[in-house]
Structure formats: C-alpha cells, structure tokens
Amino acid sequence: TGSFQSQDKFKCFVSIAGISDFTKLLRSETFFRGSAKMNKIMHGDAFEDKEYLDSVSAINYTDKIKKPILLIHGTYDTQVPHNQSSMFYNKIKNSNDSVEYFEIPKATHYFDEQGNRFVMFREIERFLAENLN
C-alpha cells in the first residue's frame, strides 16, 4: 500500500510475494481450502468488505504509481498465488516503465531453499543499487 498511499516517502518499492488484489485473492480457491471462518476473521469477507479491500489493493491504483517497483514471486507459493504479482505487472507496465517482475521457479512463499533466497536477495540488491543511488 505504500506504493500508492505514501509514494513521496520512498524512492522505490520492492514487493516480495505480495498481494495486489485482496478481493480476488479472498475469492480464490487458495483461501477456500482452509477454514472459511478463520479466513474471514483474519482477512475479511470478499463480498461484504469489497469496498475496503479494493481501497487497499494496489492493482486499483496502477495509474498513480510512478516510482520504480521490483516484484518478486515464487512459482510454488501456496500462500499468495504468483498470479497476484504477474497480473499486477501486466496492468502497471503500461503506465510505469520502471517496474520489473522477477519470478523464481519452484520458490515458495517463504523462499525456504537457500538457493532461492540467494537469487531473491541478489535481485533486490541489484534493484536497490540502481534506484537508491
């Protein structure tokens, strides 16, 4: 949310396995696999709370986000599907040419394997070096 609510405070943004569309995520099968009641308590209801969820979903503000963004997501993420990052990238790339999407094959939500963490941190380091000069 900082990318669209507090842009002036940052030079760039890094999103690691981030949620870009809360409503879509809560309506997906990923969140119906677990306890529906627990998901509603923790995250809200995708139908009853749609207005609020849309207001905190970055995908609805892509035209306002002008700072560089690095999106990193693992393809084996079972907590937040990697399409949350890819659909955000596909929408924002037309209005922000400083956005990068880096997908890490077989990486989980927590980047459990050391090799995946190394790749992730290497990309973050490169991106920050380029954008924080």
Place the predicted regions along the sequence by residue.
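Active-site-proximal cap/loop segments of hydrolase catalytic domains
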Residues: T1-N133
